[in-house]
Amino acid sequence: MSNRRSKARTAALQGLYQWQLMGQDVDKIDIEFIVQDIRGIDHAYFQELLRGVPQRQGELDECLGPFLDRPINEVDPVECAILRIGAFELLCRPEIPYRVVLNEAIELAKRFGAEHGHRYVNGILDKVAQKVRATEFRSRALRRRLQT
């Protein structure tokens, strides 16, 4: 995860973690990141995630809910933030291929989540992708079948 957008996801994860655990205002979180002068990130994308996830939290949690094995408030806070970022991208950024969304989320979970958190994140977001990106999911499966 070395590109600007990947770094924006990492920063958004950190900001959303603060928002989830401490209820800190996203404007203040954004200012903290500006003051830190984090270089090499897509700041506009960071802001989109940092603001978009809280704004659409209800919709995101509703989308994730059927695939979770427990209530969302009982999911590890880091993994919860990663799942919400992934669900946001799957729902709101259709130009980003679902495989990219899943791979980025898995990498975040490997770096910041619990020992096997990446498996949990992958399993949940894969099911969300099948639901909300059904056409993209089916066309990828069809291409694979045609190649064999």
From Swiss-Prot:
Q: Which GO terms describe its cellular component?
A: cytosol
GO BP annotations of the record are: DNA-templated transcription termination; transcription antitermination
Q: Is Zinc found in the keyword set?
A: no
Q: Which UniProt keywords apply?
A: RNA-binding, Transcription, Transcription antitermination, Transcription regulation
Which InterPro entries does the entry mention? Answer: NusB-like_sf, NusB_fam, NusB_RsmB_TIM44
For the keyword RNA-binding, the answer is: yes
Q: Which GO terms describe its molecular function?
A: RNA binding
Functionally, this protein is described as follows: Involved in transcription antitermination. Required for transcription of ribosomal RNA (rRNA) genes. Binds specifically to the boxA antiterminator sequence of the ribosomal RNA (rrn) operons.
Family statement: Belongs to the NusB family.
What protein am I looking at? Transcription antitermination protein NusB
Which organism does this record belong to?
A: Nitrosococcus oceani (strain ATCC 19707 / BCRC 17464 / JCM 30415 / NCIMB 11848 / C-107)
Question: Lineage from the top down?
Answer: Bacteria, Pseudomonadati, Pseudomonadota, Gammaproteobacteria, Chromatiales
